[in-house]
Amino acid sequence: MKNSSQIQIIRLQDNLSSIRKIAGWTAEDLGEKIGVTKQTISNLENKKSPMNLTQYIAIRSVLDYEIENNKENTVLPQVITILLDKADEFDEKDYTNLKEAISAVSISAAGGVAGATLASVFTGVLAPIGMLGAVATPIGAIVGETSYWIAKIMKKKDEKQGRQ
């Protein structure tokens, strides 16, 4: 059985390509931000290499920074919340539908669509699959939660080391 840190790492790796594109980054951009090559990012996205905890923390940190400092990209925090932070709140079918919808939005983002237009694409893709209502609560819960993921990891590490 996988622990919660492993599940979070797998979720990020499974969705890294879509998240990166919605952030507006190339593989090279993300690699530069975390100190690895674009080939390393490609290998993570294509699952040629497993993502480790250090890579997870580095990527989540730059994503948090982007969310805090790029208020024009309103889709990124929603996608992070849906695919990573609140994924357990969806049944498997809904989560799969959301992943597919977000993947479609990421294609628009990779093509240069950004800001309010990307937000419209995001809403437009969710509406036909009946997921707008399903994501309303998780999206509303974004405020103040952009770094709670690291608290969960550190708490687990502290518990393993006998610290409270």
Model-based region annotation:
Residues M1-K21:
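A short, Lys/Arg-rich alpha-helix, primarily the initiator
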Residues L84-Q164:
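Intrinsically disordered, low-complexity tails and linkers flanking structured cores
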Residues L53-N73:
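DNA major-groove recognition helix of helix-turn-helix/homeodomain DNA-binding modules
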Residues G24-S42:
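Short alpha-helical DNA-recognition segment
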Residues R20, G31, R60:
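The alpha-helix within a helix-turn-helix
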